[in-house]
Amino acid sequence: MKIVYWSGTGNTEKMAELIAKGIIESGKDVNTINVSDVNIDELLNEDILILGCSAMGDEVLEESEFEPFIEEISTKISGKKVALFGSYGWGDGKWMRDFEERMNGYGCVVVETPLIVQNEPDEAEQDCIEFGKKIANI
C-alpha cells in the first residue's frame, strides 16, 4: 500500500505516519510518499489509493503540488478504491467534503469516511491508527 500526502506544517505528514502504523500493525506493507516524490504509474497499480492533504486558504486542496497531482490522476482512477485524510486549522472540513465529492465524481469508491483532524493529530493519534487498520482490512 502507498500513502500519498502533502503537508505544509507537518500535521498531515504525522497523520500519514500514524495511518501507516495502523496498516503495519495489521500485517500489511506500506510506504508513505510526499506527493512531490510520487511515481503515478506505480501508485495506480495499488488496489487502494490513500490520499492526504491539509486544508489551505479558503478550505481548498494545496494548489501547487497536490492539486496538479489530483488533476493528473483524475482520468485514470475510475473504479479505484480511495481513502482520504487531512488536517486543518480552521473551518468545518469543507475542503474534505469537496475532495470526497470530486473523487466520487471521478468514479472512485471512497471506502471509509474521510479522516480529518484539527491542527496536530496528538489527541487523534489512535483515530489515525484505527483508520489505517480499517483500510488494511478492506
Curated annotation (Swiss-Prot):
InterPro entries: Flav_short (IPR010087), Flavodoxin/NO_synth (IPR008254), Flavodoxin_CS (IPR001226), Flavoprotein-like_sf (IPR029039). Keywords: Electron transport, Flavoprotein, FMN, Transport. One of its GO terms (molecular function) is FMN binding. SUPFAM superfamilies: Flavoproteins. Its cofactor is FMN. Residues 1-136 form the Flavodoxin-like domain. It comes from the Bacteria. Belongs to the flavodoxin family. Low-potential electron donor to a number of redox enzymes. This is Flavodoxin. The lineage of its organism: Bacteria, Bacillati, Bacillota, Clostridia, Eubacteriales.
